Amino acid sequence: MLERLTTEQRNNKTQNLDEMTTKEILQVMNEEDQTVAIAVSKELEHIERLVQKVIASFRQGGRLIYMGAGTSGRLGILDAVECPPTFGVEKEMVQGLIAGGLEAVTNAVEGAEDNEELAVKDLQSIGLTAKDTVIGIAASGRTPYVISGLRYAKQIGATTGSIACNKGAEISKYADVSVEVETGPEILTGSTRLKAGTAQKMVLNMISTASMIGIGKVYKNLMVDVQATNFKLKERAKRIIMEATDVDDKTAARYYEAARGHVKTAIVMILLQCSYEEATERLQKANGFVRKALQ
């Protein structure tokens, strides 16, 4: 079975990898990595459909749940944990589940990816509902933990999606929308942390970013819902206000304070020259979309 997967096959360009110079190794890795973005581009239609599903979940109060084992699980967690500071959402809104739990983030947990019962328990522990979207991630497209999770999600009526790096992936059968990015053989045979992992990260970036834009977390190309939890982010928040309104730093700082540290509110207050209360009301009526609040 494994030998049929392109991610497990040997790469003809690197048959003598151990004899290459460091420069040659880096060159071939770079050349192979350049093929990843092209492979992802061929799946944009499916990624778009999946994003629309995620947006629909968010709009009805649902969540985005990533599931994976090993590198795939870690990438899901990586994308999930960046959403609160970047888009100002609750940490529960986007979550990453990895076979074997948090220990598996830094250590291999033997047998975890083959444990189908564990997937169901993990989803039950977060109270999965029909409003949620579950996206299973597996380079091979056949990880039992992920398949079991998708199967359970479908049973309770949740939306399901999958990301694999082989065509005709097993997990695609359990997904409402499947993304199959064919990255081909790795330079190091079977090491799917390389091209396959890069492809998965690119797709996850697209899904979370486009979905958040779809629910009003971005104005122009600015992170207007950024959570300023430290000095650097507070300075970034003020710069965002400056970029969005063309005011100087002192004015941005003054409105940032007046808006109680809420970038969106400060922007609306400046551009419409209105009170904090009016800006807040406009944003609420516009479901958080700054552009709509300004109309």
From Swiss-Prot:
<dbReference type="GO" id="GO:0046348">
    <property type="term" value="P:amino sugar catabolic process"/>
</dbReference>
<comment type="pathway">
    <text>Amino-sugar metabolism; N-acetylmuramate degradation.</text>
</comment>
<feature type="active site">
    <location>
        <position position="113"/>
    </location>
</feature>
<dbReference type="GO" id="GO:0016803">
    <property type="term" value="F:ether hydrolase activity"/>
</dbReference>
<dbReference type="GO" id="GO:0097173">
    <property type="term" value="P:N-acetylmuramic acid catabolic process"/>
</dbReference>
<feature type="domain" description="SIS">
    <location>
        <begin position="54"/>
        <end position="217"/>
    </location>
</feature>
<dbReference type="InterPro" id="IPR046348">
    <property type="entry name" value="SIS_dom_sf"/>
</dbReference>
<dbReference type="GO" id="GO:0016835">
    <property type="term" value="F:carbon-oxygen lyase activity"/>
</dbReference>
<dbReference type="InterPro" id="IPR001347">
    <property type="entry name" value="SIS_dom"/>
</dbReference>
<dbReference type="Pfam" id="PF22645">
    <property type="entry name" value="GKRP_SIS_N"/>
</dbReference>
<dbReference type="GO" id="GO:0097367">
    <property type="term" value="F:carbohydrate derivative binding"/>
</dbReference>
<protein>
    <recommendedName>
        <fullName>N-acetylmuramic acid 6-phosphate etherase</fullName>
        <ecNumber>4.2.1.126</ecNumber>
    </recommendedName>
</protein>
<dbReference type="InterPro" id="IPR005488">
    <property type="entry name" value="Etherase_MurQ"/>
</dbReference>
<comment type="function">
    <text>Specifically catalyzes the cleavage of the D-lactyl ether substituent of MurNAc 6-phosphate, producing GlcNAc 6-phosphate and D-lactate.</text>
</comment>
<dbReference type="GO" id="GO:0009254">
    <property type="term" value="P:peptidoglycan turnover"/>
</dbReference>
<dbReference type="InterPro" id="IPR005486">
    <property type="entry name" value="Glucokinase_regulatory_CS"/>
</dbReference>
<keyword id="KW-0119">Carbohydrate metabolism</keyword>
<feature type="active site" description="Proton donor">
    <location>
        <position position="82"/>
    </location>
</feature>
<keyword id="KW-0456">Lyase</keyword>
<comment type="subunit">
    <text>Homodimer.</text>
</comment>
<comment type="similarity">
    <text>Belongs to the GCKR-like family. MurNAc-6-P etherase subfamily.</text>
</comment>
<dbReference type="InterPro" id="IPR040190">
    <property type="entry name" value="MURQ/GCKR"/>
</dbReference>
